Amino acid sequence: MLDFINHDKDPETGKVMRKVRSFVLREGRLTAGQRNALDTLWPRFGLERDQGMLNPESVFGRDAPRVLEIGYGMGQSLAQMAAADPDKDFIGIEVHRPGVGALLMEIEQQGLSNLRSYCDDAVEILELCIPDNSLARVQLYFPDPWHKKKHHKRRIVQPAWVALVQRKLQPGGILHMATDWENYAEHMMEVMDAAAGFSNLAGPSAFSPRPSWRPETKFERRGEKLGHGVWDLLFEKRA
């Protein structure tokens, strides 16, 4: 699953300083179907950073609420959400090509016209391609928890990332995060409690029930049978 690159700005120049990469790019083997999808379907459903700032009406042929998911893995849940909510347009960002190929296959098999994907670094896409105040929802589901304390700095959910997401959400837009690591859930809540411009939809420092739009994964169901928890956080951008 794609994670973010935590970054800060140089206080003197204001330029972004890329510091700690929070994903490891391990290119898995492509299946024949995934390779064919990348070759034949990417021109129709793929988005490129070189295209510059996204023009949603040009891409989707309409102006509808837009949902962005960072790190969609193999794409089944994202495709399921797009199929279940045809009145919204969905954009995924994933750096691993097998996952992108798998999503493209889902798009074709399900005949989805409201789903597109980047295969790129999320921070650069957010900065260069996603207009400010343009997203109805940003989704981050089960990011790498980097459970060792010495690696916590690699976690995607950091103040700089939250501030960037806040810029991209429209007023009233939702940041939805989910994790199955309790320590990471606590870290997420700590960062969000300190973030400016957000309101916790469940109340101060409270976790939310899983909303209807987030599909329950097989992995999640197995974990629940073993007594493992899942924590959802829903925060709304204040106007």
UniProtKB/Swiss-Prot annotation:
<feature type="binding site">
    <location>
        <position position="148"/>
    </location>
    <ligand>
        <name>substrate</name>
    </ligand>
</feature>
<feature type="binding site">
    <location>
        <position position="144"/>
    </location>
    <ligand>
        <name>S-adenosyl-L-methionine</name>
    </ligand>
</feature>
<dbReference type="Pfam" id="PF02390">
    <property type="entry name" value="Methyltransf_4"/>
</dbReference>
<dbReference type="GO" id="GO:0008176">
    <property type="term" value="F:tRNA (guanine(46)-N7)-methyltransferase activity"/>
</dbReference>
<dbReference type="InterPro" id="IPR055361">
    <property type="entry name" value="tRNA_methyltr_TrmB_bact"/>
</dbReference>
<feature type="binding site">
    <location>
        <position position="180"/>
    </location>
    <ligand>
        <name>substrate</name>
    </ligand>
</feature>
<feature type="binding site">
    <location>
        <begin position="217"/>
        <end position="220"/>
    </location>
    <ligand>
        <name>substrate</name>
    </ligand>
</feature>
<dbReference type="InterPro" id="IPR029063">
    <property type="entry name" value="SAM-dependent_MTases_sf"/>
</dbReference>
<feature type="binding site">
    <location>
        <position position="69"/>
    </location>
    <ligand>
        <name>S-adenosyl-L-methionine</name>
    </ligand>
</feature>
<keyword id="KW-0808">Transferase</keyword>
<comment type="function">
    <text>Catalyzes the formation of N(7)-methylguanine at position 46 (m7G46) in tRNA.</text>
</comment>
<feature type="binding site">
    <location>
        <position position="121"/>
    </location>
    <ligand>
        <name>S-adenosyl-L-methionine</name>
    </ligand>
</feature>
<protein>
    <recommendedName>
        <fullName>tRNA (guanine-N(7)-)-methyltransferase</fullName>
        <ecNumber>2.1.1.33</ecNumber>
    </recommendedName>
</protein>
<keyword id="KW-0489">Methyltransferase</keyword>
<dbReference type="InterPro" id="IPR003358">
    <property type="entry name" value="tRNA_(Gua-N-7)_MeTrfase_Trmb"/>
</dbReference>
<comment type="similarity">
    <text>Belongs to the class I-like SAM-binding methyltransferase superfamily. TrmB family.</text>
</comment>
<keyword id="KW-0819">tRNA processing</keyword>
<feature type="binding site">
    <location>
        <position position="94"/>
    </location>
    <ligand>
        <name>S-adenosyl-L-methionine</name>
    </ligand>
</feature>
<comment type="pathway">
    <text>tRNA modification; N(7)-methylguanine-tRNA biosynthesis.</text>
</comment>
<keyword id="KW-0949">S-adenosyl-L-methionine</keyword>
<dbReference type="GO" id="GO:0043527">
    <property type="term" value="C:tRNA methyltransferase complex"/>
</dbReference>
<feature type="active site">
    <location>
        <position position="144"/>
    </location>
</feature>
